[in-house]
Structures are given as structure tokens and as C-alpha cells.
Amino acid sequence: MKKNLLSLFSGCGGMDIGFEGGFKVPKSVLNIKINKDWIEKEDEIYYYLKETIFETKFANDINKYAKIAWNDYFIKKRSSENNETADKEIFKVGSIVDIVKEYQNGNTDVFPQDIEIVTGGFPCQDFSVSGKRKGFDSHKDHNGKRIENNPKNNDNIKTTIPSEETRGKLYMWMKEVIEITKPKIFIAENVKGLTNLGEVEKIIQADFSDIDAKEDKKEGYLVLTKVLHSGMYGVPQSRERIFFIGFKKSALTQKALEELSKTTISEKYTPYPIPTHKLNGEIHTSSLKDLMINFTKSAAVLKDLEEPEKSDDFSQKYYSKAKFMGAHCQGQKEVDLEKLAPTIRAEHHGNIEYRRLSKENGGKINEELEKGYQERRLTLRECARIQTFPDDYNFVIPKKGMKNRFEVSASVGYKLVGNAVPPLLAYHLAKKIESNWELYFGEEIKKTENI
């Protein structure tokens, strides 16, 4: 029996892909000394990961293009699995604020019943190091539009007190959804930069903990926080994110509640996955420390891809043509194939890193330059590989019968892939929670053939 999952701020579905499993990854990203039992099958290039116990029943994002990309992947995936047309209405486009208000105004069917897990990467632009770091003081509304006191008269006048409907406080509406659906567990993701903004992390943790809480503190949610580095889980990228994980206290066994309430949670009870990869020779103390392998180099996921002009894959054909702006600017460096790739960004104003630079601009990949390969930025497929999206996920989707017209363009695709949680990191989280489900909630998981 699958566990029903509700996905918020879903974007193109990186978290959803990981939590459902059943996708393929290049062999180089998996530590088979530790995770061999995750593999359903393999071929020369890929490992096909097993499905998990989770199934997405509701997804939501304000970006209409996210739905197009999400549906393109998931409907195709589910149709092939079930030999029937998948439900096209799982993904609902719109602001989370408007959807919650729709529920509050009487449409109680807006959210599915029997939701056991809620996930969501609430908007990070206001907390990001690469953004303007407005945090709670964001002056954009829940639709991403700038808030003005009187925009008709003066476009420079801003509101003085951001409300809970501003972009920096949309996690409060995720909280509302959790209060409505009452899942056993929820996972909220954001950028590491949030931890450096004063008391923001503690405030968000306290707000989530307050869900359905009573004075005796026996109800509500027990909320944990931890920063995870994607590179420690095989993702060939330097990407750090904070994960808030909340447990419904009344759903936990007494033993699990006691263990999860400790200042230091044991390896057995923690919901956070144990690292499988080393970054730079740092010391690890986990039970798996002797089985860990070195991080996945960028070369491992990039070297086998054809050059764009030779590829039939639209996500490999199209890439940013923004000109080189000088090494002092963001996104003007060449990916070092022997290291982790830099963080794949969502913004697309000439800040997509280079797959290779010319000699004149400091390029160092002589082997490729000598073959006549041209200076260019990372393609969508290369960004997707670095993020561990499966190769059958399309980030550039052409309009049928219309040459050079797109349902999802390359420019949009860069934003989608850069905003996503790496599916492999999400899979590590999902498998840890799956393996501990009975430990936490006392419910035996009935295994199926491919779980």
C-alpha cells in the first residue's frame, strides 16, 4: 500500500521524482557498497532505482510551465507503469495562498484525503545568497509581484509591513496545508543561506512546531532541522540546503517520540540519510564511514554527452548564448571536470556556468579545445545531469507541429532545473524515512515486488 504524498511548491518535481523513486541515474552517482539494494535493474550506463512507498496525489506550483514539464514526465511514467492514462489533474497551478483560501471558503475537496506526508521547497529567493536576501522583509506578494502602496501614482513606494502573503512568508501557508491535511510527517526545504539570517531558522522551526499544538505540548509537531550537502549523497554538485522535518507527535510511537526529542538523535532514529560520499577527506564517524567513496566528479555525468549540434535531445540542443562577461562576474567560470560542479542556479541572466571556455577566456580543458570544441555554457541536459534528473525528463518541450516554438523554452527550463531539489538527494531522504516508517509509526510496510 502506497503512502499518499502532497507536494507543495513542486516546481518541475525534483523532490517528487526522488520521493517516488523508479527513475534512472548514471552509475557513477551511486555508492553500491552501501546502496546496492536500491537497484531494480541496470544497463551499461544506468542504474534503475526501485520505487519507494510514496505516491504523489497532489502537486502545486504557481508556474504554469512547471506543470507542463511535470506532467510530461509523470504522466508518461505512470502511463507506462499502469498501462492507463495517468490523472492530468494531480498538478494544480496557482498560488498556495489562493488554494488555501479556496479550501477555507468551502471547497474542502481541493486537497486529497488520507495524506500521510507533505513535502515542499518554499520560495528561497528571499533567503538565498545569490538573491537579495530580503527574508521575511520581502516586498513581493504570493504571486511573485512587487507590492506597492499605490502603484498607479508611484512605482517606487513599497509597503512598510510585509504580511503573511508576501513571498518570504509563504511557508506559513504550507503550515496551513499541514494543519488541514494532518500528515504523519512533513519535509520543508530551503537554501542554506536562511541559517545566516538572524533568528529566521528558529522562527520557522517554532512556527512549524506550533501546528495543532496544545498547551500541554502533547499534540502538534516535533520539528527537526539539518543542512544537507548534496555532494555527500552522490550528487555531482556543491549544493547545500536546509531541511525541516516535522513529525506528528500523536502518530509517533512513545519510543520514537522519546528518541526524536533527544538533543542528539541516534543514527538509527534520525530521519536524515547517512552520507555515502566524502567531499575533501573530512572525518566521518557514522557506521558507514569505511564504506564511503569519494564525491562524484562532474566529468562522470558530463563526458558521455554529445555536443549540442550533434544531439537529437532538445534539452541538449539548446543552451544559453549569453556572452562571456569576465571572470569577475557570477556564472562566468568553466566547470572543473575533476571536482563537484558549482550550484546550478535558477536565475538566467548570463549566470549559467560554462561547460568550457576558450583559451582566450581562460579555458583549461585542452583535450576538448584541441578537438575544435567551441566555448559554450552548460546545456539544459548537462544542468539536469548535475542535478541528477533522469535523461527522460524533458526541460525543453517543443510545440507539436510548430517549428521553433516551445511549450517550455530553454530559458524557462534553466529556471525549472535550477530551482529543483536534486532527485537523488530526495531519494536518499525518502529511503531513510521509508526504512524507518515502522520504527516511527508502528505501521508495518507491506512490500511490493519493486519496492
Predicted regions and their residues:
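Cofactor-binding loops of NAD(P)H-dependent oxidoreductases
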Residues: 94
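Intrinsically disordered, low-complexity acidic Ser/Thr-rich regulatory segments
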Residues: 39-58, 152-165, 368-372
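Class I S-adenosyl-L-methionine
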Residues: 99-115, 125, 129-339
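C-terminal target-recognition/interaction regions appended to catalytic cores
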Residues: 307-451
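Short, solvent-exposed loop/turn segments at secondary-structure junctions
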Residues: 13-14, 65, 123-127, 192-193, ...
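Conserved acidic residues
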Residues: 57, 89, 115-116, 184
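Conserved S-adenosyl-L-methionine
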Residues: 2-87
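Extracellular structured ligand-interaction cores
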Residues: 2-5, 57, 239-241, 339-341
